[in-house]
Amino acid sequence: KWRKCVTEMGTLNGKKYLMEAGKMITSNMILYNKDLFKAKKMDGEDLYTLQKQGKLTLNKLISIMKNMYDGKKASTVVDIVPFNLHIQFAYAYGSQIVSRTPGTTKFQSTIGSNEVTNAFKAAQDLLNSGVVVNNAGSSWKWARDEFLKGNYPILIGSGDLENIASNCSFDLGACVIPDLNGKPVCEISDVQWAAIPYNVKNPHDVAFVWNEMADYIFDVNYKLRYQDIVSSDVMQLLDDISKRQVAGELKVDYYNVINIWSDGVGGVFNQMIAGTTTPASAIQAVNNMIKTKLKTYE
């Protein structure tokens, strides 16, 4: 209802007015336990060091994840739900689920691209092989709690940097999901939307301001939040992320403009995560569902 309200009320005299605001997004980050890397004799493969050297490609990351796996216990957990691994891999492959034409509310489903299919397959292979924990059905906090306890060396897609950095008893490392060529991903799916309330007395003035602000990303002062709890390396990483966001490199995946976990879409994704349907079949099944949902916002 809120999303529908936003797109309807964001219209004035035939023109659509929307704005977005971002925070210091950490969902593209990978947190890792340097102590466990050392225990596995993998401290020579420090992820952030490799990233700064331009050597951490997605395939290199996957190789390290596999090398950290002993055939019994997974090396990696994914924050909140395992599907977030598929999402991050889609960004690493250079695509997304839903895109938007800048300055408008015209959305397109891009989940049917070859890039997303290949990304989902790579992510699902890691789940199926046991390299990554399939925590479907667990509490949304399970992965971050297990990582914080020191039970797994790698946490992908963490939105809990502040809590983990404040409370972990191990040497914490961080990097960003790399794309296939080794460039750090800078893409999010959680943005703030706003619309003009119907009873505003000066809607034209509000619309003018919002129209000027549309498609801008506002950075926040993250330094006071993190500078006393993270290492200099992690702080440098946050600085780099902030600079890229402000420079206009931040991309947005708009799949949250619809509820992908309803109307059958989520059920298909859950079948894929459980391994009962292939990524290609899942994507084929949900592509038209997503397109149909997006039509309600035209």
Where are these regions (language model features)?
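Extracytoplasmic/periplasmic substrate-recognition and gating elements
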Residues: 11, 166-227
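Conserved C-terminal helix/tail region of periplasmic/extracytoplasmic solute-binding proteins
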Residues: 198, 203-204, 217-298
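Short helix-initiation/N-cap motifs at beta->coil->alpha
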Residues: 53-60, 134-148
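Paired acidic/hydrophobic, glycine-rich loop segments that form the ligand-binding mouth/hinge
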Residues: 153-158
